Amino acid sequence: MPAPKEVIEVASHEIAISNPDKVFFAERGFTKRDLVQYYLAVSEGALAGCRDRPGTLKRFPNGAAEAFFFQKRVPEHRPPWIETATVHFPSGREAAMLVMHDAAAIIWAINLGCIDLNPWPVRNTDLDHPDELRVDLDPGPGVAFDDVRRTALVVRDVLGDHGLAGYPKTSGSRGIHINVRIEPRWSFTQVRRAALAMSREVERRAPALCTTKWWKEERHGVFLDYNQNARDRTVASAYSVRPVPNARVSCPLDWDEVAAVEPDDLRLDTVPARLAERGDPGAGIDSAAFTLESLLELSERDEAGGLGDAPWPPHFAKQEGEPRRVRPSHARAGPDAREE
């Protein structure tokens, strides 16, 4: 027998939801239908984070606890109203990626087995100049979430001291994300450079809390992942449900909530009511776009003081000015140690 389907209308488009009763979160019993209904309820907030951006499809065909795969190229068999953008990757390859322009595009992706939304930090009108700087606070094993909260507040202060305003949200996992709307004037490399300078300043102010060390064996506390600003890196966007057992959400926050927020309170079954009652703390992110000039000046001062670039992700070609891409434990082998 063919798989059961449920046809719904979203933004004047009919979408057939396949296997709507399939359980996606076994711990809570949440189904694909529950996931669809969630995204319909938060669609305006979700679109604030992904509208007009190319995005990677991260597909969980059998639910959050099962195997997933990334799909950068949008499926050939798709409705005519699905928008795409041709994106170039560091490898030199290119692909037509999904651009989510309305709630129907989100629901279409959810029907493919996506759980969270993973957009690039660019708009489809300018694919080479990000309009978003992303701060990803990633706690190491055993690091208390309170250290993430405290680090986020230092990030807020550093951004403010350099003329920028950030919008915080829980990551939906163990961290916090802070997004900054910026003018689309700088390349991915320049935005990453600004993010690295900002992260190093946060580390200087709170060295016991956080680190910018790329190699895990050197890290402590909360890692400020500056490389999330490199081309082809994505983070889950606002109101994304995350593939964790209790279906936590990457939920936008007011800054006065950060010090006491509990990520486990922000779930698929609680966030729609919160959004309806409180409104969207991230709604103002597009009200002003900021300049990176102050952070880039900070980077120049770091470089003049001998603090150059930091390692890039392993799938990137060696970058000009990048230190040797060798983990410290291997560097002891000397100059012949293989780079990663």
Where is each model-derived feature located?
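Long, well-ordered alpha-helical scaffolding segments within enzyme catalytic domains
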Residues: 38, 145-164, 191-206
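Flexible loop/turn segments at secondary-structure boundaries
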Residues: 24, 64-67, 77, 143, ...
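C-terminal accessory nucleic-acid interaction domains of nucleic acid-metabolism proteins
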Residues: 1-29, 36, 47, 51, ...
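Short beta-strand
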Residues: 57-60, 166-172, 212-216
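SsDNA-processing nucleotidyl-transfer enzymes
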Residues: 2-11, 40-134, 138-141, 149-153, ...
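Secondary-structure capping and boundary motifs in well-ordered enzyme cores
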Residues: 31, 126-129, 144-147, 151, ...
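Catalytic palm subdomain of template-directed nucleic-acid polymerases
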Residues: 179-193
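Short, conserved phosphate-binding/catalytic loop or strand-edge motifs used
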Residues: 170-180
